[in-house]
Regions:
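Short conserved beta-strand and strand-loop elements enriched in small hydrophobics
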Residues: 38-46
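Intrinsic-disorder/low-complexity, polar/charged segments enriched in Ser/Thr/Lys/Arg/Asp/Glu/Gln
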Residues: 1-3, 40, 52, 104
Length: 138
């Protein structure tokens, strides 16, 4: 098991710590080629110093292009709340011509920890119905 690090923007950081995003996509280069299942990646928030998310690689898939990527994986797992077109446009803006010249790697990951633990509260359907009824009464 080896450890690697990448920089991410604050939106991606928030998606990761909230467990909405569990696939990170990169252009296949020497570093991303070397990362294997079981390796650890620390994603550092480039917008806020000291904020990070640590994950373990559960699966690694290499595809030939962004269209194959969007066929294999749900957009919501890569870019929550956005469309296929928005993901493709973002990748074109980030990688430019490289996007058409190199393969793409998708890292499916398991969340390990972050700089500050976030507590998640899960509600069952009954509770949600009770809340809806309460809101209607207000």
């Amino acid at each position: 098991m080896k450890e690697y690090s990448y920089n991410i923007i604050n939106d991606v950081y928030n998606w990761m710590i909230s467990r909405k995003k569990d696939i990170e996509v990169r252009i296949l280069k020497e570093k991303s080629q070397a990362i294997q299942v079981g390796d650890i990646i620390t994603f550092n928030n480039q917008d806020i110093v000291g904020k990070y998310v640590k994950v373990k690689i559960a699966n690694k898939t290499i595809v030939d292009n962004v269209y194959e990527l969007t066929e294999k994986f749900e957009i919501e797992r890569m870019m929550p709340g956005h469309s296929k077109e928005e993901l493709i446009e973002l990748m074109k803006n980030i990688y430019g011509e490289e996007l058409n010249q190199k393969q793409i790697v998708a890292f499916e990951f398991e969340y390990l920890c972050c700089d500050s633990e976030v507590e998640f509260i899960e509600y069952n359907e009954k509770y949600l119905e009770d809340i809806k009824d309460l809101l209607v009464e207000l």
